[in-house]
Design a protein with these regions (language model features):
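Loop-helix junctions at membrane interfaces
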Residues: 1-172
């Protein structure tokens, strides 16, 4: 499972400071760091499908770790518009949009991984029978949505009070 924290924050800062590609690269690097701290995958032999028996653990790592953190860097699509406005209100809107966009993409990766790899876990925990997608949506939302809100709020504080964090040194 996931946890509530600030894991998206460095990716968001780099995505706004440097743009889309550096944000994506930073997300990929964060994914590697997260995996160095330990990974949890379902044993492929527990699947009925022979493809998932072989490729399941790899696909789960790709969705739950590599892609989940890498896509947060897509917040960088708002970097140029953020930097090109003088309005504090618009800057706040752009960091909220980017934080939500990157965070929701991460959430989608976790929901897809959960729907595919955690079959029938809902009945074990919450009585949600035979609907791994609903279980995954609820379970992952319980920590992804607070993460989006927390990181978005910190980014708003940065945009309002510490905006130099979100601009490269070569921009005055």
């Amino acid at each position: 499972g996931g946890s509530i924290g600030f894991g998206m924050l460095p990716i968001l800062v780099i995505a706004y400071r440097r743009g889309l590609l550096p944000g994506i690269i930073c997300g990929f690097i964060v994914s590697i760091i997260q995996m160095l701290g330990g990974i949890y995958v379902i044993n492929g032999s527990s699947f009925d499908n022979s493809f998932l028996q072989v490729m399941g653990p790899f696909l789960q790592i790709m969705l739950d770790y590599v892609l989940a953190y890498t896509v947060v860097g897509f917040a960088g699509v708002f970097s140029k518009t953020f930097k090109n406005t003088d309005s504090k209100g618009k800057k706040v809107c752009y960091v909220i949009l980017g934080s939500a966009f990157g965070g929701l993409l991460k959430y989608a990766c976790h929901v897809i991984a959960g729907g595919v790899f955690w079959l029938n876990q809902g009945s074990s925990f919450w009585g949600i029978n035979d609907d791994s997608w609903l279980y995954s949506f609820i379970y992952n939302g319980a920590y992804c949505i607070p993460n989006i809100i927390i990181c978005g709020a910190v980014m708003v504080i940065f945009a309002l009070y510490y905006d130099k964090l979100l601009f490269p040194n070569d921009i005055s």
